[in-house]
Amino acid sequence: MEGRNSNNLKGIDVSNWQGNINFKSVKNEGIEVVYIKATEGDYFKDSYAKQNYKRAKAEGLKVGFYHFFKPNKNAKRQAKYFIDYLNEIGATDYDCKLALDVETTEGRSAYELTTMCIEFLEEVRKITNREVVVYTYTSFANNNLDNRLGVYPLWIAEYGVKAPKDNRVWSSWIGFQYSDKGNVAGVSGNCDMNEFKEEILDVKNNFKLYNATTKNISTYLNIREKGEIDSKIIGKIPAGEEFMIKWVDSNYLGWYLIEYKNITGYVSSKYVEKFQMATTYNVSDFLNVRERGTTDSKVVAIIDDGEIFRIDWVDSDYIGWYRITTKYGKNGFVKADFVKKI
């Protein structure tokens, strides 16, 4: 794997173990990113998380949160516990990807633990519409996780080296914890030291999976107050723009009730092309989205069982596969055997 680089963001991660922290001094040390422990399992809330968040933000530091995973507890319940606590302490304006800290098995096999991690990560994404990162250490990745987790970015821990060793799950990292014995002004005792790439930063995923676009128009499609040709125009959709059909109103045959940029109204069905939406079929946990339409192609995303996605086209190069868009805006190919059109 690649090593440390002076162009990377400098960071620390902290918890209640560090007590009260002077984040002004931390910033003056050149630290740019602070990851804060929020929760553990479904039973522990870090009592310093709120003050750490508010004080770090007040100094203009980039803030992220992590959850320490307990494999003997329900994964989805842990995800909800994590996000509920962030909401409880008012931590809604964080800057970095939400982190899953996995470093204990509690008797779980690599397959079982990886499945639980995926359940946690996808539940966090579902609740927050924000992106995630996996924190672990090199030997743990090699011995206790499998390559299904490789679709998520990595924050790797390995001490006393300039570059982390290769592992069987990931080929690159966006975070590297290189020491647990850092000495930073403003922090009592030792703290973990990290370098982060820009990819650790996250913005709200505002992608919306639309189910329709315009057709047979060259300029604008009028949005009307009611499904009548002489009804008041309340908005316009530029040709080629996507929007959401909400439903067909039995009071206005030949019209769709739609939503476009916070405008809800009616458009004539003559000028609407509906996309083919779909969901999973005969899938127990999740459906792999692959880079190409082959079973040995790289997995680039996953779709939870029952999740809705859009079929973009059938690619003649990959018979038996659909090119799709997930609800998070990820593109790739899924096997047609596991797809139900809706």
UniProtKB/Swiss-Prot annotation:
It comes from the Bacteria. CDD domains: GH25_Lyc-like. The gene is lyc. It comes from Clostridium perfringens (strain 13 / Type A). Keywords: Antimicrobial, Bacteriolytic enzyme, Glycosidase, Hydrolase, Repeat. The active site is at D13, E103. Signal peptide: none annotated. Coiled coil: none annotated. Sequence repeats lie at residues 230-252, 253-272, 273-295, 296-318, 319-342. One of its GO terms (molecular function) is lysozyme activity. The keyword Hydrolase applies. InterPro entries: Glyco_hydro_25, Glyco_hydro_25_AS, Glyco_hydro_fam25_subgr, Glycoside_hydrolase_SF, SH3-like_bac-type. This is Probable autolytic lysozyme. Residues 212-276, 278-342 form the SH3b domain. GO terms for biological process: carbohydrate catabolic process; cell wall macromolecule catabolic process; defense response to bacterium; killing of cells of another organism; peptidoglycan catabolic process. PROSITE patterns: GLYCOSYL_HYDROL_F25_1 (PS00953), GLYCOSYL_HYDROL_F25_2 (PS51904), SH3B (PS51781).
